[in-house]
């Protein structure tokens, strides 16, 4: 494979550990609570949670496959019957054992779960968990058809119509997640059963898709296969998988539009009139080739997955036009469509991007999966071009929206991540019905919970990459742990200490692995440690916060927001960093109408918010004292506390329940004032204007990821100034 554009590549997961209290705690939570909980959810064993039907479907498909093998030519396969985008049983307590239930993409619940399992087993071998996973894999593989096809929706509903609705029915999306899960499990355990199944499915897809006559000229409706195929190519060494990924990226949006041809054919076969005005192929990023796209449009998760896959292909092929397209779409997202919490996708209509600068707070969609997809895109752009802005955005998406998607006890989840919540509006205003004031135990469309689990268990792969020159280690995120890398022919160990995200203080200790010739104190090794200079610390002006103990001979070069420290490193050398972490009072671009006259507070990678439990009801009457804060930033108090989470259930199904959790955290206390609710004013709907009477107070702000862990109450990120 050519790697013209490639500058660095991810470090192997087993070569990086996380030990700091922040991320290690979350990985342990996923390992001990979330993974077992989600396995129960996949098997419909969580009381009060929406059924998944995921493993039910695999078992049904496996049973049908066994029947086929037993009966041979006498077997009569099901003939396709459309049962809707989501099929539910008449009696949820007694689903038919041979029917498919759930959404068309329900298989991916397993795939993301097994991916998280693989990541967890990499650093925490667990015989019981591995046995459970092996049993699940046996069931899944038993559902695979002899030709390699593996999607239970069509296996159970009728293979005569498979690959006829790529736009909506997610077969290639299911393949992509299956493949990523299979790779993670193989890399953790060395077991190939699921990986071989993924390869057989990939081989079948490769035999059916392409530009040659007789092949399907289509591409995924919901993207992720592109990333998965590149990863599969790099895992197996099979170039044709990377070629198929490139085909999907380049073919998308070419004339004639494949989805339009597909829609017309299906309408004709179903005896319907084709209605072109009802179609919006931009929603699928398929109205034009990516090299002609200038704006991030459509379903936010699909879009960011597509851009990440395109970046992978640009990296492999060295295609400068494709890379320029990725850069152009990145700029549109971060300059005009990105929430301060690292979320994307402003509207619930299609879970999609809205128009430029349309970033409502109380109706924000900001899906958890979309923030994760943005992190995927950012990491791949970092591999091509180590620019700190990619890591800045990636960090924000991970620390804010991604973590907000999961309760602090790991037992409930947000699909949607608003920046302002009034519970009554959520309950009574249908326009805000998608916004939930408390997390849910599970979802019928449960893409987000296992997505959060897999990225948390894999987060260290976002922290580091290794330069393709084999002599540079990039540090993109600051989390405590250990990193092993071969640099300039020497096996190097870096031990990272970090107090993130509460302070910018930490260190990187250099060591040489035992048995390497450089482990002798008289030896050294020449390589580069490239440290990101975070935007929240001042960017490149923060380079003075980095020192190398007793080593004036280490060269220092700043480029694209990274400080490159190069020299002959000795065993025991230590790099210290103490990045400033001021509180930033942030205003949105004036074109963001919803934030006019408002401010938000950011410290380090964290966005902060106000909750009613700390600040009282009617948060719209609470103002930040912007004049005082601007004139004296020291008036904002930064406090290290123990945050007490916990909430009782709101109903017999356990909605809103959060187990008692005590967690170290930082809060902000800012000068503020409240509008006094004058009875003469509030008794009338309208009245003559007069200046609001002010009551001086303070406002307590908590990290955004921690909101809704103390029961149902108001929340806002932006405060009136």
Feature map (PLM): residue ranges:
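Low-complexity, Ser/Thr/Pro/Gly-enriched N-terminal "stalk/linker" regions
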Residues: 1-109, 134-153
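C-terminal beta-rich recognition modules with glycine/proline-rich loops and embedded aromatic residues
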Residues: 15, 21, 245, 326, ...
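Hydrophobic core segments within long, regular secondary-structure runs in both alpha-
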Residues: 20, 27, 39, 55, ...
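Well-ordered alpha-helical scaffold segments within catalytic/enzyme domains
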Residues: 23, 114-127, 176-191, 225-238, ...
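A conserved hydrophobic secondary-structure block that centers on an alpha-helix together
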Residues: 157-235
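Catalytic-core region of carbohydrate-active enzymes that cleave or remodel glycosidic bonds
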Residues: 315-336, 359-411, 422
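Solvent-exposed beta-strand/loop surfaces of large extracellular or lumenal domains
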Residues: 539-566, 585-591
């Amino acid at each position: 494979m050519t790697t013209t554009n490639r500058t660095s590549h991810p470090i192997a997961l087993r070569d990086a550990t996380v030990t700091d209290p922040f991320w290690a705690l979350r990985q342990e939570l996923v390992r001990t609570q979330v993974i077992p909980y989600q396995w129960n959810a996949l098997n419909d064993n969580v009381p009060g949670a929406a059924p998944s039907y995921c493993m039910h479907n695999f078992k049904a498909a496996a049973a049908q496959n066994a029947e086929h093998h037993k009966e041979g030519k006498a077997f009569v396969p099901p003939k396709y019957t459309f049962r809707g985008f989501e099929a539910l049983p008449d009696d949820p307590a007694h689903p038919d054992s041979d029917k498919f239930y759930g959404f068309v993409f329900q298989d991916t619940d397993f795939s993301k779960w097994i991916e998280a399992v693989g990541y967890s087993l990499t650093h925490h071998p667990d015989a019981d968990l591995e046995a459970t996973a092996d049993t699940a894999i046996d069931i899944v593989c038993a559902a695979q058809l002899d030709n390699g096809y593996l999607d239970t929706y069509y296996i159970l509903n009728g293979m005569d119509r498979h690959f006829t609705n790529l736009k909506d029915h997610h077969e290639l999306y299911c393949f992509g997640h299956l493949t990523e899960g299979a790779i993670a499990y193989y890399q953790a355990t060395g077991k190939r059963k699921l990986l071989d199944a993924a390869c057989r499915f990939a081989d079948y897809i490769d035999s059916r898709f392409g530009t040659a006559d007789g092949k399907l000229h289509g591409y995924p409706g919901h993207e992720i296969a592109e990333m998965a195929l590149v990863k599969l190519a790099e895992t197996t060494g099979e170039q044709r998988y990377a070629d198929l990924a490139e085909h999907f990226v380049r073919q998308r949006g070419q004339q004639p539009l494949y989805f339009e041809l597909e829609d017309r054919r299906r309408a004709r076969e179903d005896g319907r009139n084709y209605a072109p005005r009802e179609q919006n192929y931009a929603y699928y990023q398929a109205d034009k080739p990516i090299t002609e796209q200038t704006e991030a449009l459509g379903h936010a998760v699909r879009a960011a997955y597509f851009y990440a896959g395109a970046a992978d292909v640009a990296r492999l092929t060295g295609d400068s036009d494709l890379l320029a397209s990725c850069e152009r779409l990145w700029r549109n997202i971060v300059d005009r469509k990105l929430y301060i919490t690292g979320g994307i996708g402003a509207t619930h209509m299609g879970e999609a991007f809205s128009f430029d600068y349309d970033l409502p707070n109380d109706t924000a969609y900001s899906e958890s999966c979309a923030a994760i997809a943005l992190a995927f895109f950012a990491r791949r752009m970092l591999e091509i071009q180590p620019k700190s802005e990619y890591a800045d955005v990636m960090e924000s998406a991970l620390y804010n929206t991604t973590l907000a998607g999961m309760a602090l006890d790991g037992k409930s989840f947000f699909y949607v991540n608003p920046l302002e919540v009034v519970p009554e509006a959520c309950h009574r205003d249908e326009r805000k019905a998608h916004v939930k004031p408390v997390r849910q135990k599970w979802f019928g469309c449960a893409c987000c919970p296992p997505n959060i689990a897999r990225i948390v268990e894999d987060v260290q792969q976002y922290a580091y990459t290794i330069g393709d020159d084999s002599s540079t280690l990039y540090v993109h995120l600051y989390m405590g742990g250990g990193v092993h890398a071969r640099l300039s022919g020497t096996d190097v160990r870096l031990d990272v200490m970090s107090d993130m995200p509460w302070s910018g203080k930490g260190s990187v200790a250099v060591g040489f692995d035992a048995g390497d010739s450089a482990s002798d104190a008289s030896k050294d090794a020449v390589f580069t440690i490239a440290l990101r200079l975070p935007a929240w610390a001042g960017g490149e002006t923060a380079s003075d916060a980095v020192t190398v103990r007793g080593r004036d001979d280490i060269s220092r070069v700043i480029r694209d927001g990274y400080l490159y420290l190069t020299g002959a490193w000795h065993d025991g050398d230590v790099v210290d960093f103490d990045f400033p972490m001021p509180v930033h009072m942030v205003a949105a671009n004036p074109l963001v109408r919803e934030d006019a006259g408002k401010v938000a507070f950011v410290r380090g990678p964290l966005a902060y918010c106000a909750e009613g439990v700390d600040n009282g009801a009617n948060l719209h009457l609470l103002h930040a004292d912007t004049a005082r804060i601007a004139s004296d930033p020291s008036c904002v108090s930064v406090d290290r506390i123990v945050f007490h989470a916990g909430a009782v259930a709101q109903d017999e199904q356990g909605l809103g329940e959060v187990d008692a959790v005590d967690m170290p955290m930082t809060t902000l206390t800012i000068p503020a004032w409240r509008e006094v609710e004058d009875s003469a004013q509030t008794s009338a709907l309208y009245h003559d204007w007069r200046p609001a009477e002010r009551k001086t107070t303070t406002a307590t702000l908590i990290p955004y990821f921690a909101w809704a862990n103390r029961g149902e109450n108001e929340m806002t990120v932006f405060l009136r100034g």
